[in-house]
């Protein structure tokens, strides 16, 4: 599935909920489905800087596609990174680099996060795209 298709699917899923309490519960549930990072990768090198909570992300290239695993010590943050990994994992680095993240505004996520969590969201997106740039360089 292409990035835009996954983003549209997420927007559709979020539109099923009437209020933000239900959406937060949905994000918490998504966090429970997150492909968890192996304990050996829970290092300072893999912590996303700029997040209030601890968020670890590991990336590896599998058949020219990036596969992400992650974890967080906070349930909402775990849900946020789960959404991002759902969008970007198993995609080619070039597609990740080129992808926009307008779907985040469409679901209203940024406006319903505290300023520190919103900054963390931006940091997560930035880090996933930096991984894509690094791996794209290796492919070239």
Regions flagged by a language model, labelled:
Residues 72-74:
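A short interface-forming secondary-structure element
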Residues 90-107:
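Glycine-rich phosphate/pyrophosphate-binding loops
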Residues 81-91:
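Alpha-helical support elements that line or immediately flank enzyme active sites
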Residues 3-54, 61-65, 102-140:
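N-terminal intrinsically disordered, cationic/polar leader segments
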Residues 77-79:
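Short Cys/His-based metal-binding microdomains
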Residues 65-67, 83:
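Short, local alpha-helical segments
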């Amino acid at each position: 599935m292409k990035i835009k298709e996954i983003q549209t699917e997420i927007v559709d899923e979020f539109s099923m909920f009437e209020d933000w309490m239900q959406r937060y519960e949905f994000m918490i549930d998504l966090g429970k489905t997150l492909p968890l990072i192996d304990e050996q990768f829970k290092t300072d090198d893999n912590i996303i800087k700029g997040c209030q909570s601890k968020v670890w992300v590991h990336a590896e290239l599998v058949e020219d596609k990036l596969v992400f695993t992650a974890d967080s010590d906070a349930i909402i943050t775990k849900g946020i990174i789960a959404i991002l990994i759902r969008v970007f994992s198993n995609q080619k680095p070039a597609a990740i680099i080129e992808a926009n993240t307008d779907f985040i505004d469409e679901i209203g996520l940024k406006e319903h996060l505290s300023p520190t969590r919103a900054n963390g969201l931006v940091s997560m997106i930035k880090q996933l795209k930096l991984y894509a740039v690094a791996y794209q360089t290796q492919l070239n």
